[in-house]
Amino acid sequence: MKNCLFTLVAACLACAGCFDNHNRPADVFTVTSLDALANTNRAEIVRLFLRGAARPVTDADLEGLSDSVLQQLDLSELNLEKVPGKVWGLKGLTSLWLVRNKLAAIPDEVPQLPALTYLNLDGNQITAVPDSLSGATKLRWLRLNENKLRESPPSLSALKDLRRVYLRKNLLTSVPEVVREWTELEDLALDDNAITSVPDWLGTALPNLKSLSLKGCPISRMPDDLSGLRGLTTLSLANCPLPSEEVVRVRKALGDNVAILF
């Protein structure tokens, strides 16, 4: 009965938008509180969601989790300034949420999670992306919204499997040059940054891009050549100061198959 209740609670939270839903199976063993964790065989837990727990999560709380069974871990909204060291021993982890903590940096230990495909660090105080993150080569989904990033290092070109990157509400003044190396990228969000221009390569270097969002950036012109963006399904330029003639040009260049939001 307890296991059913935990799974039901997790499902309700997911429906409410508390968690991102990316292929999470519904029939796995899920725990959603520290109280439940204390009364559970930890070696059987597949999904552990401790978002907003009543007290800080410590290494002792994570003791006994199976490094081959646990796949998803949510340690969001816990006022963490440092990630518990036990996390980096969970070698089977595929998804890690560290949303709205007090992290000033992306932990250098992230590459110690060889199966990690999803990393969510939204709403922290991160000012830079370390070169060490280039070792997390299985990453497909990276969220760094609402931080204090000004740039991304070229070393991140090693992240060849990235499909979705979200960098909304940072301090970027240009599209990071490393983005052009992420040729498998399907979804890129740079909303509400101080980006004033879009590099010419963005129109040609990302053949698999389906969604591009630059909403709220002070951009007045898109690249002259947009031929490489014909695979787009959605382009958001809402609240960008594009002159009317530029709006007409972009619409004509991309055609009717792209939903363009101005």
Set out the residue ranges of the language-model regions.
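N-terminal capping/linker segments that flank leucine-rich repeat
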Residues: 2-72, 82, 239-241, 245-262
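Conserved hydrophobic beta-strand positions in leucine-rich repeat
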Residues: 48-50, 71-75, 94-98, 116-121, ...
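Canonical leucine-rich repeat
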Residues: 57-60, 65, 83, 106, ...
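Leucine-rich repeat
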Residues: 64-69, 88-93, 111-116, 134-139, ...
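Mid-chain, structured segments of secreted extracytoplasmic proteins
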Residues: 70-102
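Consensus "Asn ladder" position of solenoid repeat domains
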Residues: 78, 101, 121-124, 144-147, ...
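Eukaryotic tandem repeat interaction scaffolds
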Residues: 143-204, 211
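Leucine-rich repeat domain C-terminal region
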Residues: 193, 205-221, 228-262
